[in-house]
From Swiss-Prot:
Root EC class: isomerase
UniProt name for this protein: Inositol-3-phosphate synthase
Disruption-associated phenotype: Inositol auxotrophy. Increases the RNA level of genes involved in inositol sensing and metabolism. Simultaneous disruption of ITR1 or ITR1A lowers hyphal density and leads to a severe sporulation defect and attenuated virulence in a murine inhalation model of systemic infection.
Gene designation: INO1
Pfam families to which the protein is assigned, alphabetical: Inos-1-P_synth, NAD_binding_5
Entry cofactors: NAD(+)
Enzyme Commission designation: 5.5.1.4
Length: 558
């Protein structure tokens, strides 16, 4: 069996490696100093033997619209206490789709950084790093230096105790039986000189057999499907995956595991009353092997029942209502959907900029082509539809936030005399084509057609070329790091209440995801700035700190 799948493998274990000279590693791969970089000196923050206890006041405002249309605003305050366990322990990362472009790049990046393997390129020597990771390669404003008045920034990874990506024990499943060295060669993502050095570390690593239901992915994937859990009994498959997780955890002496889907995009599952609308019905549907229970939902259920976080990195509706309810019942953690790596991230930023500038986007047209297996799978219409849905909703909340530019559903109903459920919205189309010659290099072309002053028009065209897996891989590390962290955070609403885990749906992961999963009934936030601010503010709240204040009164008033 695979050393990273079921058997502990010391030569892949960073805990047993000699300590690296931190001056010789890339800043994004450096370790936090022993005992942590930050210590908050405040009555609101207490450092205990096993964690950090912090008091935080959530300040907001309630707004009531009167019959005359005027708004009544009242300030609100709600007091919380957060407790973050400081011991990270040994963490496993199990990838569904381990042998794909993303999976092989995750393992290769982990090993290259763990062993500090550098390689030759045409531009010179390249050092391993975690560039592209929000957690490892970006900073947050902590405060100001009282002597100089200058802002002080720290890496997000130093805010709270977090697992270092070098320390993940990586394993997982794939419908393809190729060993990881051959899968890496097939992916054609990394430079040959790096691959050459990684082959000895990856040649004995093979993915565990996975689940294959041909109706859920494109028919063109059948030639890869030679590593399958036998049979078509979905209850047996569920128990098989649960056993894999338990065995992986036990054999690698892990304290926790995160499971993440980075496999093929599936078609959407139909939501059927009595089948997948409740937790109990979903469990019964698995027992009867109902055709609308997808592989990704089986993996999500297995993770939930084993009490480990599950993140969906693809756009399909893995989290049918019954799956969310199952997570709620078991107080397990889930997050999704669909990695937000390139074009969509730019789109959410640019659309927000235009709307906040008082400019009205009338249409957004997005064209993509790529040559990797993701593009091949998406060449099938049913799988493309899943991606189209996730990419098309990314500007909804920004449009809804500006009723000056866009008529609301209520306004349209009054104007037409008909019941309108959705307000005015830019025309938005998405096209994705498979072009094998370009490989993992994804080309994206966006046109933004907007209304200006006095009926004027503006056209913006953006051409974006990127390595798909080299953008997605850092997000996978971010999602796993943050999901593990959030399992160690509990809260209570007053000093005498019971400590509780966070709500099951980890919407704090939204920054990394195209179609963020949120608590049922709550509005989705797609604004990249708001998503980033929410993550920063939560990390600060766990330290008892207020969120960043950009008012800078000392420079503007006195």
């Amino acid at each position: 069996m695979s050393p990273t799948a079921l058997d502990a493998c010391d030569h892949h274990d960073s805990f047993s490696l000699p300590a690296q000279d931190q001056s010789k590693v890339h800043p994004s791969a450096r370790r936090t100093p022993e005992g942590g970089l930050i210590k908050v000196e405040s009555d609101s923050t207490v450092y205990e033997a096993d964690g950090i206890k912090a008091k935080f006041t959530d300040r907001g405002a309630s707004v009531i619209k009167g019959s005359d249309g005027k708004l009544s605003v009242k300030k609100t305050e709600k007091n919380f206490e957060f407790f973050t366990k400081s011991t990270v322990g040994r963490v496993g990362l199990m990838l569904v789709g381990l042998g794909g472009n993303n999976g092989t790049t995750v393992l290769a990046t982990n090993l290259a950084n763990k062993y500090n393997i550098s390689w030759h390129t045409k531009n010179g020597i390249q050092q391993p790093n975690y560039i592209g990771s929000v957690v490892r390669a970006s900073t947050v404003r902590l405060g100001t230096d009282p002597e100089t008045g200058k802002d002080v920034f720290v890496p997000i990874s130093d805010m709270l105790p977090m697992v270092h990506p070098n320390d993940f024990v990586i394993g997982g499943w794939d419908i393809s039986s190729l060993s990881m060295d051959k899968a890496m060669l097939r992916a054609k993502v990394l430079e040959w000189d790096l691959q050459r050095q990684l082959i000895p570390l990856m040649e004995n690593v093979k993915p565990l057999p996975s689940i294959y239901y041909p109706d859920f992915i494109a028919a063109n994937q059948a030639d890869r499907a030679d590593n399958l859990i036998p049979g078509d009994d979905k209850k047996v498959h569920l128990e098989h995956i649960r056993a894999d997780i338990r065995r992986f955890k036990a054999d690698n002496h892990l304290d926790s595991v995160v499971v993440l889907w980075t496999a093929n995009t599936e078609r959407y599952a139909d939501i059927i009353p009595g089948v997948n609308d409740t937790a109990d019905n979903l469990l019964k549907a698995v027992e009867t092997s109902h055709e609308e229970v997808s592989p990704s939902t089986i993996f999500a259920m297995a993770s939930i029942l084993e009490g480990v976080p599950f993140i969906n990195g693809s756009p399909q509706n893995t989290f049918v209502p019954g799956c969310i309810e199952l997570a709620e019942k078991h107080k397990a953690f889930i997050g999704g959907d669909d990695f937000k790596s390139g074009q969509t991230k730019v789109k959410s930023v640019l659309a927000e900029f235009l709307v906040n500038a008082g400019i009205k986007p009338l249409s957004i047209s997005s064209y993509n082509h790529l040559g990797n297996n993701d593009g091949k799978n998406l060449s099938s219409q049913r799988q493309f539809r899943s991606k189209e849905i996730s990419k098309s909703s990314v500007v909804d909340d920004m449009v809804a936030a500006n009723p000056i530019l866009y008529k609301t559903a209520e306004d349209l109903s009054k104007a037409t005399g008909e019941i309108v459920k959705k307000g005015e919205h830019p025309d938005h189309i998405v096209v994705i084509k498979h072009v094998p010659a370009v490989g993992d290099s994804k080309r994206a072309i966006d046109e933004y057609y907007s209304e200006l002053l006095m009926g004027g028009r503006n056209v913006m065209n953006i051409f974006n070329e990127c390595e798909d897996s080299l953008l997605a891989t850092p997000l996978i590390f971010d999602l796993a790091i943050l999901a593990e962290l959030l399992t160690r955070v509990t809260y209570r609403e007053n000093a005498t209440g019971e400590w509780q885990p966070l709500y099951s749906v980890l919407s704090l992961l939204s920054y990394m995801l195209k179609a963020p999963l949120v608590k049922p009934g709550e509005d989705v936030v797609n604004s990249l700035n708001r998503q980033r601010n929410a993550l920063e503010q939560f990390l600060k709240a766990c330290l008892g700190l207020e969120h960043s204040n950009d008012l800078l009164l000392n420079t503007r008033v006195w």
